[in-house]
């Protein structure tokens, strides 16, 4: 009998697990309008600069500027994700929170292999994060360390490690180990200059030099520097140093962008080998900023890899995406190549992206003219890679290329202007572009001459972006676009003449995001208002007032329960279970935990007006998980907090309706949401 009971219990557990797993596989996860399918985005909320890029123990760490309580830039934290392949990402909890020294601005992370800091406590090498803290505009540099592969972090008791020397803008430290002199080197943005510091232990830093006066572009404040060495044309005996700098305004295509310098670094000073007024732009699009490279890539790999923030400070806060805002670019490999005009940085997509290709389509030796039938008329998609090689001569079409994400009155042109020898992206007809007047500025161009009579285009299209690599990455254009979901067409075109296409391959690219981490035995969740998202903590809702989401399930008598956590963010208000609701959440019952007023409350909405039925006074803390359960039978309602009966009340206004969730003046998360009839 005991054995039979154990078997039944095991079977019940398996069935329950299967039910949760099936319900968790909600196809709506990472499927909102404009949601990138293979680019990194946070599950919810605002993101900007990538930070703390470090590789350790088989994982690429991506930290990023993150506002957990809003869709616009706000109090900065470090969000965190890891990847084993640069393609699929695992979301992790926030790594660094603001403290009395300020919010957490951009910075870097390193593996302290020799334990120079003395932070190591176990067998794992310490990861050390170096970041800016901003308190009401006063910026200093601080550090934190991790002894568990970056899962938890301890802030150094001696912070800040570099106090402010009297500069308004003093931020974004990028640190690397300089093996030749066995020391750490930091590059730090200060106004429109880069300051260089050195250290033996990551805790005490010495000022070494300054770079930037009268060098390159000074259209805006300099930010997010990086400094690294690369071989020229792969020759290990010929190496040069690259200084990458983000510029807050005045970039080549308007607004924020990136420039770089090529030269020499002797351990304390960087020297630009080009004329001071020569500006080398990293990307000619509107939407590539704050890119920094991963540190500690193994010598067996030796690639210099990075990614950037795909947005522009002119309109970043207004881009109409929800429940998240902003994406990173695809990861790219950086190389130095010698051209007739000098040594230049080239960027190519990482080879790992080839693993998400679907069934490819190929064409060879096509001739395209304005009168040609669109050979790509049968192609449809919103996430794909294009590889094309065109033969170009003085008699070729004046313009040729692709129209991607085409639909009714929508398309984005990615092409080549032969007469002016320019690669271009034109998003003026790409879709939603009225949210900010700075967004639709027409065509972005990059100088690109044919090589041996050929022009190569490699184009990555996602639901809200295009990244174009011309002639094996010599020039790059990165732009976000916002077409309708239905705009999935593709066209190969030529204007004012014909052009020969030597080869063309289109690779569909697969979605890299898996099943939702939100656990519930109900489906069909539909947002009524506010901002809702599935996150690693559960279903997150955020609103300054009342916000609702409803499932497709309904009932009259039931047990309905959930884990609820009110986050320490905007409002510190309440999270609620809603039941017997109408389809608009204007009428129905709610049971909540209220951190603002320290109570559990049972109330109802009648035509949108709230009235309290019963309440129980008890401390409700933010960032603490509570289990709230409601039992409904006829007109009687029992409400339990952490399995303790706190309210037993009667009301007969509503007899049945839908199940849902509510937040009021808060960011709250709900997990393990279940109902039993």
From Swiss-Prot:
Pfam families: 3keto-disac_hyd (PF06439), Glyco_hydro_32C (PF08244), Glyco_hydro_32N (PF00251)
CDD domains (UniProt xref): GH32_Inu-like
Induction: Induced by low concentrations of fructose, but not by sucrose. Repressed by glucose or high concentrations of fructose.
Record field: pH dependence: Optimum pH is 5.5 for inulin hydrolysis.
Cellular localization per UniProt: Secreted
Residue positions of the active site: 49
Catalytic activity: Hydrolysis of terminal, non-reducing (2->1)- and (2->6)-linked beta-D-fructofuranose residues in fructans
Temperature dependence: Optimum temperature is 55 degrees Celsius for inulin hydrolysis. Is rapidly inactivated at 60 degrees Celsius. High stable at 50 and 55 degrees Celsius.
GO MF assignments: fructan beta-fructosidase activity; sucrose alpha-glucosidase activity
Chief subcellular location: secreted
Any one biological process term the GO annotation gives: sucrose catabolic process
Family, per entry: Belongs to the glycosyl hydrolase 32 family.
Protein name: Levanase
Gene: sacC
């Amino acid at each position: 009998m005991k054995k039979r009971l154990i078997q039944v219990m095991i079977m019940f557990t398996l069935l329950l697990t299967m039910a949760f797993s099936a319900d968790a596989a909600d196809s709506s996860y990472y499927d909102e309008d404009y949601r990138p399918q293979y680019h990194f985005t946070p599950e919810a909320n605002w993101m900007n600069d990538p930070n703390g890029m470090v590789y350790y123990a088989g994982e690429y760490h991506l930290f990023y500027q993150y506002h957990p309580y809003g869709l616009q830039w706000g109090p900065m934290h470090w969000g965190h994700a890891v990847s084993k392949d640069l393609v699929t990402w695992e979301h992790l909890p926030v790594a660094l929170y603001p403290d009395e020294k300020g919010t957490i601005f951009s910075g870097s992370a390193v593996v302290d292999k020799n334990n120079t800091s003395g932070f190591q406590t176990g067998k794992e090498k310490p990861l050390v994060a170096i970041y800016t803290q901003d308190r009401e505009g006063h910026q200093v540099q601080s550090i934190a360390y991790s002894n568990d592969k970056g899962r938890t972090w301890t802030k150094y008791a001696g912070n800040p490690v570099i106090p402010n020397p009297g500069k308004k803008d003093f931020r974004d430290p990028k640190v690397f180990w300089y093996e030749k002199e066995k020391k750490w080197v930091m590059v730090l943005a200060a106004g429109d200059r880069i300051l260089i510091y050195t250290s033996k232990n990551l805790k005490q830093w010495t000022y070494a030099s300054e770079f930037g006066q009268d060098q390159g572009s000074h259209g805006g404040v300099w930010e997010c520097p990086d400094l690294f060495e690369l071989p020229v044309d792969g020759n290990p005996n010929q190496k040069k140093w690259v200084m990458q700098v983000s510029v807050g305004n005045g970039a080549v295509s308007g607004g924020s962008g990136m420039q770089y310098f090529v030269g020499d670094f002797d351990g304390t000073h960087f020297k630009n080998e080009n004329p001071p007024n020569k500006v080398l732009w990293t990307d000619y699009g509107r939407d590539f900023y704050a890119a920094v490279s991963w540190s500690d890539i193994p010598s067996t790999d030796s690639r210099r890899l990075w990614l950037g923030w795909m947005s522009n400070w002119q309109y970043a806060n207004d881009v109409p995406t929800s429940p998240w805002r902003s994406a990173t670019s695809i990861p790219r490999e950086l190389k130095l190549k010698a051209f007739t005009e000098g040594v230049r940085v080239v960027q190519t997509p990482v080879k790992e992206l080839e693993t998400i290709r679907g069934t490819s389509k190929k064409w060879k030796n096509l001739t395209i003219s304005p009168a040609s039938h669109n050979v790509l008329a049968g192609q449809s998609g919103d996430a794909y890679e294009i590889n094309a090689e065109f033969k170009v001569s003085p008699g070729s079409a004046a313009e040729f290329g692709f129209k991607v994400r085409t639909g009714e009155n929508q398309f984005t042109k990615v092409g080549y202007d032969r007469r002016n020898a320019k690669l271009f992206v034109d998003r003026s007809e790409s879709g939603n572009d009225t949210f900010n007047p700075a967004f639709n500025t027409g065509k972005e161009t990059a100088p690109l001459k044919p090589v041996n009579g050929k022009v190569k285009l490699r184009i990555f299209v996602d639901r809200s972006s295009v990244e174009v690599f011309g002639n094996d990455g010599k020039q790059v254009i990165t732009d976000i676009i916002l077409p309708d979901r239905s705009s999935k067409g593709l066209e190969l075109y030529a204007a004012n003449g014909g052009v020969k296409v030597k080869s063309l391959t289109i690779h569909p690219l697969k979605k890299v995001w898996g099943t939702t981490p939100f656990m519930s035995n109900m489906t069909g969740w539909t947002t009524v208002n506010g901002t809702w998202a599935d996150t690693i903590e559960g279903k997150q809702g955020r609103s300054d007032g009342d916000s609702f989401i409803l499932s497709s399930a309904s009932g009259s008598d039931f047990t309905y329960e959930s884990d609820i956590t009110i986050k320490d963010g905007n409002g510190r208000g309440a999270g609620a279970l809603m039941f017997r609701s109408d389809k608009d959440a204007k009428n129905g019952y709610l049971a909540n935990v209220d951190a603002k007023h320290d109570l559990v409350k049972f109330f109802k909405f009648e035509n949108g007006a709230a009235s309290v039925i019963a309440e129980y006074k008890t401390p409700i803390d933010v960032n603490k998980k509570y289990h709230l359960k409601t039992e409904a039978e006829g007109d009687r309602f029992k409400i339990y907090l952490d399995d303790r009966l706190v309210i037993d009340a009667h009301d007969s206004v509503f007899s049945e309706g839908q199940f849902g969730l509510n937040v009021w003046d808060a960011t709250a998360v709900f997990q393990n949401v279940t109902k039993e009839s």
